[in-house]
A protein has these predicted regions:
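N-terminal beta1-alpha1-beta2 module of alpha/beta enzyme domains
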Residues: 1-73
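Glycine-rich anion/phosphate-binding loops
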Residues: 21-25, 81-94
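Generic signature of intrinsically disordered, low-complexity segments enriched in small/polar residues
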Residues: 41-45, 86, 95
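The substrate-binding groove and active-site-proximal loops of carbohydrate-active enzymes
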Residues: 74-82
Length: 95
């Protein structure tokens, strides 16, 4: 039995970088994880935090899925109280 490795990436914004840089770093890290044989890649949703760029997991999941081939990508959490449940379900079904 082999161990399946996963990553939970909160898209941190390093000092001196922009949120755009952080999101590009997230996609790059996902590619590297896939190349190293990781099984899953999780992203998180955060709002109003200058040190974290992941405010739209459904958009970020689409970017990561488009940049990788075998990596299973998902959201480690969605702030459901901010959205209509049907809209969340529809957004993730499209992915």
């Amino acid at each position: 039995m082999s161990t399946r490795l996963s990553v939970l990436d909160q898209s941190p914004v390093p000092e001196g970088s922009t949120p755009g840089d952080a999101l590009r770093n997230t996609v790059d890290l996902a590619r590297r994880c896939e190349a190293m044989g990781y099984h899953r890649y999780w992203v998180a949703e955060h709002h109003g935090m200058t040190g974290l760029a992941g405010s739209s997991p459904e958009a970020l999941i689409g970017s990561i899925a488009g940049a990788t081939r075998r990596l299973r990508v998902g959201s480690g959490g969605v702030m459901l109280t901010h959205y209509a449940p049907l809209k969340v379900a529809e957004s993730f079904c499209v992915l």
